Amino acid sequence: SRGLGDVYKRQHGTSVMFKPDAEIFEETTVFDYEVLLKRMREQAFLNAGLTIELSDQRDPANPQGEKMCYEGGIRQFIEHIHKTRGLESLSEQVIYFTGSKGDNAVEIAMQYNDSYNELILSFANNVHTIDGGMHELGFRNALTKTLNEYGKRFGLLKDDSKLMGEDVREGLTAIISVKLTDCQFESQTKVKLGNPEIKPFVESIVSEKLMNYLEENPAVARAIFDKSLAAQ
């Protein structure tokens, strides 16, 4: 590698130009603007404050482009999802917390809405893990466990009653983003995270931070429980 040479003061960063090779890009060599826009917007949400500009000049008569920067990061991601899907949120603010241990870090945003569906999007080093993995499993386990503990502690659940995972996830939109130094994906397509140490790490952070939030926001906690109990 020759490294990067000096640049003029008005220049910055690295430019990469390429022409898609049909032997490598087997499905298509024509890029879909909407697919690229969705991916770029996703990255802008995952990296709060990062500005990403997409410009499509292939058709001079009809150029397309968009500049994206979200200071609220994945909190705005949740708001964007609810707005575009026409969903009514159960609380004004998105539940948001972070945590780290050693070289591992997790960032979570979640909010309940008036639908009956769950939407959990998980990412590892900005890669969308479509099939989930250890980070998502840790979140799901902690969510169910924490809500049951809170419910029994504050009398929202009877001693013999219990909320199931599908009950507490009904109407939930959540974004889970973990940053690791060594991602272990279970396939070449990187759709599932396999790092075993991430499950207890995420589970511990969610259990602590979510319990603190519920205790500090009893009205939101009550709304979540009303919805979860109705789902039984």
Question: What is the predicted role of each segment?
Answer:
Residues 1-232:
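GHKL-family ATPase ATP-binding module
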